[in-house]
Amino acid sequence: MGGAARAVLLGFLQASSSFDVRDSTGKVCIIANLTVAFSVEYKSSGQKQFAHFFLPQNATSQSHSSCGEGNTSHPILALSFGAGHLISLNFSKTLDKYQVEELTFHYNLSDETLFPNATEGKVMVATQKSVIQARIGTEYRCINSKYVRMKHVNITFSNVTLEAYPTNDTFSANKTECREDMVSTTTVAPTTPKHATSQVPTTSPAPTAAPSSPAVGKYNVTGANGTCVLASMGLQLNITYVKKDEKMGLDLLNFIPHNTSASGMCESTSAFLNLAFEKTKITFHFVLNASSEKFFLQGVNVSTTLPSEAKAPTFEASNDSMSESRATVGNSYKCSAEENFQVTDKALVNVFNVQVQAFKVDGDKFGAMEECQLDENNMLIPIIVGAALAGLVLIVLIAYLIGRKRSHAGYQTI
């Protein structure tokens, strides 16, 4: 289990960048220090590829940022970098809170530096709602990694200190801590790779056929007091590596359930699920927060043997500062949508149709389900569409009845 404790903290690979937004009088409306890492899926020669890069320290905020104008618009922190890339945080506030109402990322696939040989050379847009919230008069603080998942894009915020609507031009003395910092039960010293870089080399990876979605397998870990982890999921590992010729390679591996062995360990507040397939092993570290009676996925450790073309024969990565797959003890966490766990900027663990329960499991039976936000959003869309259609039908019916009544009123009795 030593590997699970060696966390490779993504945010420590790149120093934080500082930005502020001022109105026409020079008063600050947004101030921020943060590290932002991007992982973007794109197509190259018909094959799926991944670009990994950081928000550079020379990103600029002057062109597109604004403090808003009265009640007509809200403050926005917009950071432009590279060949037409833009990440923007749109803020709003209530009486006692401010929040990032919407996160938007524009990325230009014609940028050969970040997206070599991209099939489509156009600007793409990814958005996500409400990713940050804090009390008015406090700074928002989040040292641990905060993952934001969008279509084809994963964004990781770390080492974040920001404040909107500050009283003065500096951060407030009081702070609002993010959930990721509050639930951390262990402090892990960051480890820095010997050759850390802020973006992948500009040469294109060799085309790699993307496998289909993995089959779903069911796994469990049993200790002295019974089952402590029960999991059902499809599992896929995505590794970006350097080849011997210094080009980039992509290794995509689907776990085959009947060839996958499960083991693990049960402790009072920790549970480990080890899944081994061929020469690859993934360890999931679940933690119990006794005060809130919640369990969550805190860590993922990956070790594998790379293809013979790789410069290094083996690969190992770990992140023990996550806060994923959260549910009440006795219940199970369920997510039908694909989820992507970013271990490092070179390693992604993708899970499909996952259902997992830890610490209080009745044999091989899952407890009541707590659905993920992605599934709730997917369920909400047809409800909204259905309600809109029902409203449209009602409007047409009312218009028809009014028209019919008026036509009757036009007749004269002879």
Curated annotation (Swiss-Prot):
Cytoplasmic face of the membrane: 404-414
GO process annotations (BP): establishment of protein localization to organelle; lysosomal lumen acidification
Q: Name the membrane topology term.
A: Single-pass type I membrane protein
- Keyword Transferase carried by entry: no
Q: Give the residue ranges for region: Second lumenal domain.
A: 225-379
Q: Which UniProt keywords apply?
A: Cell membrane, Disulfide bond, Endosome, Glycoprotein, Lysosome, Membrane, Signal, Transmembrane, Transmembrane helix
What are the transmembrane regions? 380-403
Sorted alphabetically, which PROSITE patterns does this protein's record hold? LAMP_1, LAMP_2, LAMP_3
Matching Gene3D superfamilies, A to Z?
A: 2.40.160.110
Stretches for region Disordered: 186-213
Sugar attachment sites are 33, 58, 71, 90, 108, 117, 154, 159, 168, 174, 220, 225, 238, 259, 289, 301, 319
Instruction: List where in the cell it is found.
Output: Lysosome membrane; Endosome membrane; Late endosome membrane; Cell membrane
List the cysteine pairs that form cystine: C29-C67, C142-C178, C228-C266, C335-C372
Q: What is the superkingdom listed in this entry's lineage?
A: Eukaryota
One Gene Ontology term of the molecular function aspect: ion channel inhibitor activity
Q: Which residues lie on this side of the membrane: Lumenal?
A: 19-379
Annotated region (First lumenal domain), positions in chain? 19-181
- Where are stretches of biased composition, namely Low complexity? 196-213
> What is the role of the protein in this entry?
Lysosomal membrane glycoprotein which plays an important role in lysosome biogenesis, lysosomal pH regulation, autophagy and cholesterol homeostasis.
The family note in this entry says:
Belongs to the LAMP family.
Name by which UniProt lists this protein: Lysosome-associated membrane glycoprotein 1
Native source species: Gallus gallus
